[in-house]
């Protein structure tokens, strides 16, 4: 027996008919159509509530006080770690040299050297701030800090 295109049919359970709601009590999905009585889920567009909405209660983000701020000083200044300095060639280092070595972002207007790691080269810092620990490490390596 040969098979024809009109003999093809989908596998059992592969295609189901769309459930029709609101078509009488006998269907099991009449009247309220499976949505229950009242409430947001019974309404059209129901269940779509804003993030943070707590049903009319003052939401958490309004109950808690504002804290902190973003310093404008931090935006204009940059930190350079002492072990990053060690990757540069020994000698004079100023703000322009740090920027040329990509150790300082372009938005920064000033930089500060912070101690982290060890210094083995002799550096002379000019016009760049340094913490007390970084200053001591630079001087211990034979360098100096000129503000």
Curated annotation (Swiss-Prot):
Compositional bias annotation for Basic and acidic residues: 1-20
Coiled coil: none
Name of the protein described by the UniProt record: Large ribosomal subunit protein uL15
Family named by the database record: Belongs to the universal ribosomal protein uL15 family.
One GO CC annotation: cytosolic large ribosomal subunit
InterPro entries: Ribosomal_uL15, Ribosomal_uL15/eL18, Ribosomal_uL15/eL18_sf, Ribosomal_uL15_bac-type, Ribosomal_uL15_CS
Record flagged with keyword Plastid: no
Function: Binds to the 23S rRNA.
Oligomeric and partner information: Part of the 50S ribosomal subunit.
Chain positions covered by the region annotation Disordered: 1-64
GO biological process: translation
Name of encoding gene: rplO
GO molecular function (one): rRNA binding
Biased composition, class Basic residues, residue ranges: 34-47
Biased composition, class Gly residues, residue ranges: 23-33
Keywords: Ribonucleoprotein, Ribosomal protein, RNA-binding, rRNA-binding
């Amino acid at each position: 027996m040969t098979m024809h295109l009109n003999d093809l049919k989908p596998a059992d359970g592969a295609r189901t008919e769309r459930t029709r709601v609101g078509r009488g009590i006998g269907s099991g999905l009449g009247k309220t159509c499976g949505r229950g009585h009242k409430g947001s889920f019974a309404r059209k567009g129901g269940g779509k509530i804003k993030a943070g909405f707590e049903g009319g209660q003052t939401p958490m983000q309004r109950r808690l006080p504002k804290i902190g701020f973003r310093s404008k000083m931090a935006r204009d200044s940059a930190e350079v770690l002492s072990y990053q300095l060690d990757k540069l060639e020994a000698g004079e280092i100023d703000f322009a040299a740090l920027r040329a070595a990509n150790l300082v972002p372009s938005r920064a207007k000033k930089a500060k050297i912070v101690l982290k790691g060890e210094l083995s080269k002799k550096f002379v810092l000019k016009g760049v701030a340094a913490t007390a620990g970084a200053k001591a490490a630079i001087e211990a390596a034979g360098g100096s800090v000129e503000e």
